[in-house]
Regions:
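Helix-start (N-cap) detector for alpha-helical repeat units in TPR-like alpha-solenoids
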Residues: 11, 45-46, 79-80, 113-114, ...
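Structural signature of tandem alpha-helical TPR/SEL1-like repeats
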Residues: 23-32, 58-70, 91-104, 125-138, ...
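Alpha-helical segment of the N-proximal tetratricopeptide repeat
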Residues: 9-46, 50-60, 91
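TPR-adjacent "capping" and linker segments in tetratricopeptide-repeat scaffold/adaptor proteins
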Residues: 1-13, 197-198
Length: 199
């Protein structure tokens, strides 16, 4: 094994270690590894994407945005970078801008349930309700046990007054995650609205 292969293997091992730390919720520990990788190579796209993802999980949006912007500047094929930028714009309720970036992420990485979930919600929130619901349904078809998707789709159906469908989605989310406060509140909202409509 030559020096470049050994170096590449070391980088991959550290990226994998950072990924495992991220998945176990140890974002700050993951960031230490990733930041060291970026000191060694400021153009390491994978490390930039992972920094952005960890910062997003910690709700440090400015830092996540900076890392994601750097990733897409260096690599226009960074679907993770475009997804994170779109997610942040959604969080700021800049729906049309979010839709553009999330569509770009979806184009680069089709059929990714999380990208589709965020794109669907941004479409729905931007006034493209039918397309938003269809996109959320696609996300749910890809990942049928995701409480976030179930709740987002349920809220969309609630807003178009399809209470039966909304309630079923929220109850499914509660089956999967009984402590899900959002789903509990949404079930209560459906019940209140159903009673109000019946008079």
């Amino acid at each position: 094994m030559d020096d470049s292969q050994r170096l590449s293997s070391d980088i991959l091992e550290r990226l994998e270690r950072a990924e495992q730390l991220k998945l176990s919720g140890k974002h700050n520990e993951a960031l230490k590894i990733l930041e060291q990788l970026l000191i060694e190579d400021p153009q390491n796209i994978s490390a930039l994407e992972e920094v952005a993802d960890n910062e997003l999980s910690l709700e440090r949006f400015a830092r996540a945005e900076a890392a994601a912007r750097q990733a897409v500047t260096l690599d226009r094929g960074s679907y993770t970078g475009f997804y994170i930028l779109g997610y942040i714009l959604s969080h700021k309720e800049k729906w049309s801008e979010a839709v553009q970036l999330l569509r770009k992420a979806n184009h680069l990485k089709p059929n990714n349930a999380e990208i589709l979930r965020c794109l669907g919600w941004a479409l729905f929130s931007s006034g493209q309700r039918a397309q938003g619901i269809v996109t959320l349904e696609r996300s749910l078809n890809l990942e049928s046990e995701n409480p976030l998707t179930l709740c987002d789709l349920g809220v969309a159906y609630l807003q178009i007054r399809n209470f039966i469908k909304a309630r079923a989605l929220f109850l499914r989310a509660l089956d999967l995650d009984p402590g899900n406060v959002r789903a509990q509140e949404c079930v209560q909202a459906v019940e209140r609205l159903t009673k109000a409509v019946r008079g």
